[in-house]
Amino acid sequence: MERLEDYIAFDLEFNQHEGQTHLIQVSAVRFRDGQEIDAYDSYVHTNVPLKSFINGLTGITAETLKDAPPVEEVIKEFQDFVGALPMVGYNAAKSDLPILAEHGLDYSQQYKVDLYDEAFERRS
């Protein structure tokens, strides 16, 4: 596994409705030399109903999202936060990266470590 000195760990929460994926939260933490140095976290406004499963899994409610910024604003802020830094995530290659790509952000070259894959390989 590549050793990263300065990187972004990120996670997305999303809701599926009528075949479309809707972001509901974008979170990221910047680490340098193993220390958290900055963080970004935003809910995302949506008018689509939240599935009860998503509410139970995340604790996010429609009330939480009603005054949140629009997805375009959140995506821009996230892009500014990440910059060109390497990224790590948990199973993000299968879910989070494709969702970001739907919003015009291609982080496939910056995505360096998938912690799900690392954990699976170490158990084998």
Q: Predicted regions: what is each one?
A:
Residues K112-S124:
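Short alpha-helix plus adjacent loop in nuclease-associated cores
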